[in-house]
Design a protein with these regions (language model features):
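C-terminal domain-closing interface element
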Residues: 332-338, 344-357, 680-712
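Short, charged/polar "capping" segments at the starts of alpha-helices
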Residues: 305-308, 437, 587
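Core active-site phosphate/anionic-ligand binding loop and the adjoining beta-turn-alpha structural block
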Residues: 324-560
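Catalytic cofactor-binding cores of redox enzymes
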Residues: 130-131, 137-149, 191, 221-234, ...
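N-terminal ligand-binding/catalytic initiation module
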Residues: 2-250, 256, 260, 264-266, ...
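Short, solvent-exposed amphipathic alpha-helical segments in soluble enzyme
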Residues: 290-292, 357-362, 443-447, 568-569, ...
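Catalytic or ion-translocation cores adjacent to nucleophile or general acid/base/metal-coordination motifs
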Residues: 233-239, 243-253, 260, 267-272, ...
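General beta-strand structural signal in soluble alpha/beta enzymes
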Residues: 182-187, 205, 275, 298-299, ...
Length: 713
């Protein structure tokens, strides 16, 4: 039941693994990482189906007999032929039971997590490899990953790797890597270590890269089952995930600016934000709502996910007494005007319908959705009218019936949202393909007066509700601000506090200079992020690695990196710092339904920016780079990329960071400026003034009257 306001069940944040019979010991002998795939087989089905962690839904790839044979043949190539008879039968059972060969037998018996840098450095031959291994293991931490045993970090199918043999090979290569080698990762498969140079990346990652005509969801299901491709989401497959903190800041900025734009307020006390999802990304929503001062109500059908976020302190209260009880609790919380997050155990459609039917005042001010609708038929969306378990069972037993249930649920979902929006609630698409999939389901999401979409026509990019990029984040990206993050490889909370102080000092400097220049829009962004970083240590954000995130522009990112590199050099920090960013950024992602949805020159569907960004980061010395198909809105809908860079205190790592970060931001600013975005044009002009070597092609605006006259008749 929902607790009363004075008896709220608020759990303190914790970063400790759960104690249970399935808990694995910490890794003691790190030399095991050097061994790779063992010559002798571990015990059969070692550690399979740990009941204390969530598991990925069963996949239904619909392989032909020839396809099944190929999947097994591909899986067995990691192993000596003497083991094939034993493993073939076992892998066939996994394929037919789970829809994928995870190779559970080879799952490590030790706890996977971001151990202190010194532990990895003792078995690795270079700092860069040790940091990469730390980041990979953080993505597979049971506290961090959504489905750790299936190597899924977030988003329902955001894979780190395809199977456990790949993890063993990857760890071995990273232990062996030197500073004149580069590791190539092909959709989870470690293709090998290649001679390169100290100036080249230590690792190049590609995930889901396919010939464009073969990028349907059915293509993905087949290729994933056959072990030849993975959906890396964004930071799952690039090994840069930092737990729900990775998105909580962006969510905070979004909700804060939604209040300013839609409600005309800076203070969200007594305001209510309703959404869904408590997974790896969506789990940031309740924490973000509290940070902004609002009441956040987040629905989640998977009880394990809800209880996990509650235990970690990311949800204040659990409401498991039904939708009407939740509405009553929200009414009281709204009146109390105190920050509060409520995790509703149930389907968000039922919750939306209860709010729509509630008498009296409008209870919901702001609304969105973060179900994994990039994968609606593979477990990313739970249809209303079915329990969580019943929905998963139907998905496997009768896919057409499940599809019909999802589409009917989406129509109900949208109808309830529309009813509340008609009364004044403001709703936006959170870049999870909600409006796209709702339109495909026949829901009423197109603008008034829009003709129904013809079969086979291009998907719409304009709906009755905006994406959060179109209305809020797009202009922030265009200004050059985006999610910059870092990980203190020492794992020391003291090091993290020192880096927070470094970042805060930089933001003050950048803000003051921008204000003096008259660039108030830059200074205002710095002010929001300064408040965030000054308070971040008190919000219990760390889950997994000692990481932090904030939004900064080109100048801010480069200066923060320089100061942190200096701190490593001077011994102020005990170990290197890994800098990175979300792929959801200024330059990293081409996605017409999210990151580039506010690009209006017709190039929203073009992927040059993301591809150029990855190549450019590699050319300028990033420690590793990644390029992915999919991420956020789904396979075939997005091209995105990211990087990781190790600041080891050397002049070389500092110079590489300065060059790479300048490109990593100005690339996207340039593209957005060429598309005639005002903030981007402003940022591009400032960038050229600051760096004389930067020469950008500037657009000239055409007069509407000239265009009309030219096309008349």
């Amino acid at each position: 039941m929902c607790p009363s306001p004075d008896k709220a069940s608020i759990a303190p944040p914790t970063d400790k693994p759960e104690k249970n019979a399935w808990a694995q010991p910490d890794l003691d002998d790190f030399s095991i990482l050097r061994r790779g795939i063992p010559d002798e087989l571990p015990p059969a089905n070692l550690g399979r189906r740990d009941p204390t962690v969530p598991h990925a839904p069963v996949r239904t790839p619909n392989l032909t007999p020839e396809g099944e044979t190929l999947a097994l043949r591909n899986a067995l190539r990691y192993f000596d032929a003497k083991h094939h008879a034993t493993l073939a039968a076992e892998f066939a059972a996994e394929l037919r039971t789970d829809g994928h060969v995870h190779m559970y037998r080879f799952r490590p018996t030790y706890e996977l997590k971001a151990y202190p840098f010194a532990k990895f450095r003792a078995v690795c031959r270079c700092d860069e490899a040790a940091c990469i291994l730390l980041m990979v293991m953080n993505n597979l931490d049971r506290r961090v990953a959504q489905y750790p045993q299936e190597l899924i970090t977030y988003g329902g199918n955001g894979s780190v790797l395809s199977n456990w043999a790949q993890f063993l090979v990857l760890a071995k290569y990273l232990c062996e890597m030197t500073t004149d080698q580069t590791l190539s990762m092909y959709s989870g498969h470690p293709m090998g270590l290649y001679p390169s140079s100290r100036h080249a990346p230590r690792m190049v990652v590609t995930n889901g890269m396919v010939v464009p005509n073969y990028s349907s969801k059915a293509d993905y299901a087949r290729m994933y089952a056959q072990g030849v491709s993975i959906y890396g989401q964004m930071t799952a497959g690039s090994y840069c995930y930092i737990g729900p903190q990775g998105i909580v800041h962006g969510t905070t900025i979004t909700v804060l600016n939604a209040g300013r734009k839609y409600l005309g307020v800076d203070d969200l006390a007594g305001r209510v934000y309703v959404s869904s999802g408590l997974g790896g990304m969506s789990g940031a929503q309740p924490k973000a709502a509290v940070i902004t001062g609002a009441v956040g109500v987040i629905a989640e059908v998977d009880e394990a996910a809800l209880r996990k976020r509650h235990a970690q302190g990311w949800v204040d209260e659990v409401c498991d007494g039904g939708a009407d009880a939740c509405v009553a609790r929200v009414r009281a919380a709204r009146a109390a005007r105190r920050p509060l997050s409520i995790g509703f155990l149930g389907n968000v459609v039922d919750l939306w319908e209860a709010f729509a039917a509630a008498p009296g005042e409008l209870l919901v001010d702001l609304g969105s959705d973060q179900t994994s609708l990039h994968n609606p038929l593979g477990g990313g969306y739970a249809p209303a009218g079915l329990t969580f378990d019943a929905g998963r069972a139907l998905m496997v037993a009768d896919p057409p019936a499940f599809k019909a249930a999802v589409e009917a649920s989406l129509r109900r979902h949208v109808a309830a949202v529309n009813a509340l929006a008609a009364r004044g609630m403001r709703f936006w698409d959170y870049g999870n393909s909600f409006l796209l999939e709702a339109s495909r389901a026949g829901a009423d999401v197109l603008p008034a007066g829009t003709a129904p979409r013809a079969a086979g026509s291009a998907a719409p990019t304009v709906f009755r509700y905006p994406t959060y990029v179109q209305d809020i984040m797009g202009d922030i990206f265009s200004l050059g601000f985006g999610p910059y993050r870092w990980v203190c490889a020492s794992g020391d909370a003291g090091d993290l506090a020192k880096t927070d102080a470094i970042a805060a000092a930089v933001l003050r400097e950048v803000a003051a200079a921008a204000r003096a220049e008259g660039a108030d829009r830059v200074a205002d962004q710095c002010a929001d992020n300064l408040k965030w970083i000054e308070e971040a240590g008190g919000h219990g954000l760390v889950v997994g690695s000692a990481a932090r995130i904030l939004y900064a522009d080109c100048e801010g990112r480069a200066l923060i990196a320089k100061r942190m590199n200096d701190a490593v050099r001077d011994g102020v920090l005990a170990a290197p710092v890994v800098i990175s960013r979300d792929h959801h950024d200024v330059s990293g992602t081409d996605s017409p339904f999210r990151e580039t949805s506010n690009v209006t020159d017709g190039s929203a569907f073009c992927a040059d920016m993301a591809v150029q960004n990855c190549i450019g980061d590699a050319a300028r010395g990033a420690t590793w780079v990644a390029l992915h198909n999919g991420g956020g809105c789904g396979w075939g809908e997005v091209t995105n990329g990211g990087f990781g860079h190790v600041l080891d205190g050397s002049d070389e790592s500092g110079a590489k960071a300065a060059s790479m970060l300048h490109w990593d931001v100005t690339n996207g600013v340039s593209r957005r400026a060429w598309a005639r975005n005002d903030n981007a044009r402003f940022a591009a002009a400032r960038a050229m003034k600051a760096e004389p070597k930067l020469k950008l092609t500037v657009p000239h605006d055409a007069d509407d009257a000239v265009l009309a006259a030219a096309l008349a008749g």
